[in-house]
């Protein structure tokens, strides 16, 4: 038993020894290998590498240490030898040199090319030598330069001419040969290269994986804590040391700065003492002269223990503001942290005078008071306490507050909106910023001072503003404003008048009601009231009031664009009409209907005339029947008035409306009366200024409930209304030839038809002598063109409505 195979163990007396019988006694070698053998050492390889051939041979060579040395094998890579191939390549003409190490002299010898010619190159060289002389070395240099200049992409012919300093014919011949040979060669280059790999384990081309160089080193000792936690602790320790070093460097720099500041302060004090500047006049003059040279004044701050701030320099810019911070009185003994005073803005910079120059100030005494670094005060950042004036600010937290250290420009008065406070700027932007006294029509009341502006969709928005005259303005009745006659007023919109604007809160005395009315009458106070355009001047004013590119929408007509005309005959009112094309189409349809009626009447008269000769008795009965089915004027009026029922203005209001006329207040036309215009969304004003259609509404005044009869004046094409006179003369109830339902939107709900109206409608429907008028008539087609549903007073009689003759 050798020492190498024996492992020493501590003897244990309590452990029983094994007892073997003679026939069961194992061999000594087997017993030693089982009990006392050294355990197999770990190979240090991965599991998939332990079965490799080279590793197993090395392990087996380690185990045969007791055998002869000849049987021990050191694993090495296999090497193959081919002597015949070697002798064929290298012939035995080798001569032993005199010395193996040959040192060439250090001279400028030409570098030998790495490219070696082969038999194919020699053939080309012999062919080229017939025309010109070229040496093999010269040919190798040319190929070598082309190879080294090319990587994956070959050089071009022009680049080859720059590389090779030879004849163009020679360069072209060699270049073409090199390109052809390079393409035929499947390798990366024509120059053979030795495989030189780094032995750091980065390449995996080694076939012997077991003997590769290990990039990751195995951890052999477990007692060192090189884990992540210890690494983080080391990083934290390094950061703390770096921070301590940085703090020491900053303290060192601060102390140097303080020492330099102390020396400079002593020099300034000595110079002032020699000059006799005990009051600081010369020092202030020097500061002012320096501030005039600078374009933007920058405050200079002394970084001492008291945090004293020098007064900032001032400039003479007309709209420039400088900020000045007062020196805080700090008590060093208690080390208090006082609140910094609020910065005050200086509107104008004044020149220093002997009266305003400071003689001795406590801050000047503390300016030269220094203390050591251990008494440095670190200013505590406190949240600003809201002051009473800030709490009372209407803007609240959004109020503008000046920041310390910032410079602001003074507001320019010529660009501010203070026309009401400054009389000189009262006329600036008067069309944009003026507010005038405003009166509304519905409801009729005075809303005070307001300003008009256009909102989304062309809607007019009133911006009201409160003044101290609001209690008086609420007492104004719009009828007072309507009583002013426009004929006796001379409207002047020049800027010479001192207008009272909406923001007249700052007026000294409150005006009375009579004074306000007198100001309105004399055009000293602007007054606005909405108006409705007349029919006679709507065409002329439409071109001037409408903006370029603005069109009249058929579905939305503003109240100002709907014409209103009152006539004195029969109480007939005319409201806004249809377009020119619709009017012409309607005229053609009416003419065609009249022709059809006349043709049918002539045919029936002929048939009646023939029947009168054969049946004289039947003639009288048929004549009486025809007369009974013909309605008179009063019956037609009563039947048509039962179709639509809506409230209309009273007679007193209509009379007042006719007698009042059109009034102007400050050049604005006032509406006449209190009647409301019927507003129809499916009717539009005519775009032609010369031709306009009208819609007639008959007002019946003798009944208990007023009624509106929609009809259309179509007596003849020559009775087209052009102005008020023509319209008044053209509107006659006896001229109405056709009555058809009109799509009129009435604000109030239509009442139910009376039984008498139903009977009259039934009789009219049973008349076979008069043709029916279907809903596809002219005015009904207008509603279909506007894509709106027909809203008739009598839905049940809409299909049976007939044209009636009025005698």
UniProtKB/Swiss-Prot annotation:
Phosphoserine: residues carrying this PTM: 538, 754
Superkingdom of origin: Eukaryota
Comp. bias intervals (Low complexity): 600-613
Pfam family, one: E_Pc_C
Residues in cross-link Glycyl lysine isopeptide (Lys-Gly) (interchain with G-Cter in SUMO2): 135, 195, 324, 362
Biased composition regions of type Polar residues, renumbered to the chain: 614-628, 657-673
Signal peptide: none
Intracellular or extracellular location(s): Nucleus
Ranges for region Disordered: 376-396, 600-628, 645-673
Entry-linked InterPro entries: Enhancer_polycomb (IPR024943), Enhancer_polycomb-like_N (IPR019542), Enhancer_polycomb_C (IPR009607)
Function: May play a role in transcription or DNA repair.
Family recorded in the similarity comment: Belongs to the enhancer of polycomb family.
Record-given protein name: Enhancer of polycomb homolog 2
